[in-house]
Amino acid sequence: MGDALSLLEARLQTVVDSEYSTVFNSDGRVLAKAVTAPRSHPPYANSAVDGYVFFGGLSKGAHCFELRDGRSAAGEAFAGVVESGQALRIFTGAALPQGTDTVVLQEDVLVEGSKLYVNGPLERGANARSSGEDVVQGAVLFAAGHRIQPQDIGLLISVGVAQVKVFKALRVAVMSTGAELCAPGTEARLDQVFDSNRPMLKAILQRWGMQIVDMGIVPDDASLVRQALDEAAQQADVILTSGGASSGDEDHMSAILSETGNMSLWRIAIKPGRPLALGMWSGVPVFGLPGNPVAAFVCTLVFARPALMQLSGSGFARPQPLTLPANFNKNKKVGRREYLRARLRNGEVEAFTSEGSGRVSGLSWADGLVELPDEAVQVTAGQLIKFFPYSSFGL
C-alpha cells in the first residue's frame, strides 16, 4: 500500500491548465501561482482602542498634556501634526497622526478643559498597531498548490488582491460497470442492485472541487467498455470506474487495461479495497475501483484522492490522523493494511460492529476511518490508534 502511494506520487503530475479568477469566486480553487501582498496589513499605524494619542511612553507618576482641537477617526484621519506635549482624541482603527506613537485608554484619563491628565507608567507604542504588523507588503501569502478557503479570501482582499491565478478544475469521468446495476429511481429486479457508487463518487468529487463527466452505467460488454473509455478519455483528465476490476469472466475493465500493456499495481494490499486496477487509456489515467460500495468509498479516500489532488495541482494529499484511544478489541493478521469504519465518541474511537464490506450503513454510521498497519496488530481497549476523520479527506 505504501509503495503504491509512493509510486503514484512519483509518476503523476499536474495535468490541468491555469486561468485567472476573481478572489470573490476563488473559494475551493487551487493556486497555480504564489500570491504576494501588494499592500501591508494594516496599511498604516492605527489605534487599537478609543482614547488619546501622543508621542512617547510615560514614566511612573502623573502627567499632563495639552489637548489639540480635532480628532482622528477610522476613515477620517487627522491631517495636522501633534507636537510634543500635546495629545489628540482618537478612536479604534483610526490612523495615528504625525508625531504620535502611543495611545492611552479613554477610561484611564481625566480631561479638564484643554488639559489631559494621565498616570504612568505606560510603554511607548502602547495600544497602537504598527503598519504591516499583520502582513508586510511583498510577503508571500500562499504558495502555488494551496487550495483557497473562505478565510483566505478575507486575507487576500484585506491586502488588496483582486484576482488570483488558479488551476482549472480537474475533469473526472465517472462510470459504473456491471449487468446487475440499475439506475436510481427505476424499478429493480430481484437480481439487480441500484448503482449507488456513481452518485456517491460524484458527490465526493464535487466536495473536492472537481468537474464531473458522468458516463452513466456501462454493461458488462468488452466493446461497450472500450467505447465508454474512448469517450471518457476525450472529455476528461482522469477516469474513475467502479466494478469490473477483478479477474472474473464478466469483469472486463482489468482485462481491457491489461491489453494496452498499461495496467499496474494490480491487487493493492488494502482491506476493504481489493481488487483495484490502475492503468492508462489514450494517455488518460484510469482508476478501476472495486464494485463494492464500501470498498469503492475507502479506496477513493485513501488511494484515489492523493492522486487526484496531484493531478489537479494541489499536491499529493496525505491526510493527517488523530491519535486516540480505542474503545474496541481486534486481532489483525499480517498481510495488508486495513481500514475500519469508526466514529469518535467521548474522546474514544468506536469501531463498526461488522467488518463486512457489504454493510453500506457503516459508512453513514461512522465519521471516519481507523487505519491498521500492514503487520499483525492486536488492538485492545485504551490502546492509542490512528483515526482519520472524514474531514481529513476533505469531506
Residue ranges and their predicted role:
Residues L5, E19-F24, K33, G75, ...:
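Flexible glycine/proline-rich
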Residues L7, Y52-D214, V349, T353, ...:
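Short, glycine/charged-enriched hinge/interface segments at domain edges or termini
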Residues S26-S40, A77-R89, L278-G279, G283:
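Short, hydrophobic/aliphatic alpha-helical segments
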